[in-house]
Structures are given as C-alpha cells and as structure tokens.
Amino acid sequence: MKQKKVKMMSKTIAVHCGHGVSLDGSWDSGCVYKGYSEAKLMLAITKAAVKYLRASGVKVQSDADHGNNKNMIADVRQANNSGVAMYLSIHCDYSGAPRGVMPLYVSGSGKKLAKCLEKTIKKDMGMKSRGVQKRTDLWELNGTDMTACILETGSIKGDLATLRDHPDKYGKAIAKGVCSYLGVPFKDGKKKPSKDIYHVRKTWKDEKSQKGAFSTLENAKKCADKNGYSVFNSKGKEVYHGKK
C-alpha cells in the first residue's frame, strides 16, 4: 500500500475518536472499567486534540465535532473520499492491558507519526511507553489511503486517572506530536499579553516633556523619581507619580 507523505499545512487531516456508533447504528462503548467507557474518555481527549490542532492552523476533519457519531468504516471512507493527508484514531486499551501509551502503525510514514506522538506524550504526560508497534490486521491502518496511526492512549484501568482527569493536557500532547510530524509550529490558542510601554512625562498630553519610554515599570519609576515626573502606560493612564 502506497501512502502519501504530508508536505504542506494546508492539507486536511482526520482525527477520530475510537468507538462510538457501531455499524448497525447502536452505541459501541469500546472497553469499559468501573463505569468508565473508552468512547466517553476518548471523546474528551479527541476534542482537546482537535482544538489545539486547529489553533495551530491545521485543518481537521473529526467525528468528535458531532459527539463521535460515525463508525470507523464511515470514518475511513470519508477520509479516503476527501483525500486527507493523515489519519489518526484515538483509543485506549482494555483493563487487562499494561500501563503506557502505544501508537500502532503499518507504513513507514505511519511509524514516523507514531514516534512523534510517543515522544510528546511521554514528555508531557510523564507516561510509560509500550513502544510503537506495527500491526497489519487493523482496518483503520489497512483501509486508509494515507499516513495512518491508531493511538492507544493507555490502559483504561492502569492509566485511568490520567485519561479521566487530564483530557485537555493529553489532547494538547497529541496535538504537539501531530504538529511535529507535520512540521507545523504548535500554538495553544492563547494570546500572549501585549507588552506595555511606560512613558515618563509631566503630563500625558505634554509629549515634549518625556524623559524616556521603558518596557519595565521599575525602570520607568526610577526615571520618574529622578525627575519628579509621572509614569503613564500606553493608554495614557497615570500608573505612578514620581517622589521628587
């Protein structure tokens, strides 16, 4: 099977949540443990991953947008028909599985994606890894026409606290791994606070009296004390009155 290598950020990728609606339309919870289901746990993580990927400028196709309402056959068909550049399916392993993340792949490009995911998840989540593993018996790997990876995020029993309590953090780690694979700078969507400039003047309107403009308030205060002037922020508000 020849799989495409992603070359540009403008390509759309598919990120889907494991299990959910089954082939006959009934609900497929995936593995379960003490009232927790794979489908529900993975939905929260997938939503977070999609959120951070979109914040990083990546176009994402995902069943998480609609409550995990499609089965994997439909997910793969949609991905193939729309020509997405990459396919990722997010799962967790059954209660008897060992702890640790385990990305699955079948192609060379899939292995590269798996390693990117393993690296960021181990680092950001502090999780053990069961290694990246090649599988040739899974539909989401064999049926896709593009780079594909099935991510086993951990054991529903052994890693329950991580999966249940930190979905946003886990989704962020996944998004970082995907961005690393795509060669796209990761962005968390948070606007960095703008740095204010502090002006030392007699009054805000008296621009000619300005003794200096500073990026730090402490330095502006020293200048104001020396000259008996005031400190104004970029909006003209007096934030400090000199002591001289």
Region roles according to the model:
Residues 2-74:
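Active-site histidine-acidic residue metal-binding/catalytic motifs
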Residues 44, 48-54, 110-126, 160-190:
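Long, well-ordered alpha-helical scaffolding segments within enzyme catalytic domains
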Residues 10-11, 53-60, 82-87, 124-128, ...:
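Loop/turn elements at helix/coil->beta-strand transitions in domains of secreted/extracellular proteins
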Residues 20-37, 93-120, 124:
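A short, glycine/acidic-enriched catalytic loop
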Residues 14-16, 22-24, 80-82, 86-93, ...:
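Active-site-adjacent mobile loop/cap segments within catalytic or ligand-binding domains
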Residues 228-244:
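Short, mixed-charge low-complexity intrinsically disordered segments
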Residues 215-230:
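A short, charged, amphipathic alpha-helix used as a generic interaction element across diverse proteins
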Residues 193-208, 229:
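Short aromatic-glycine-(Arg/Gly/Cys) micro-motifs in beta-strand/loop hairpins
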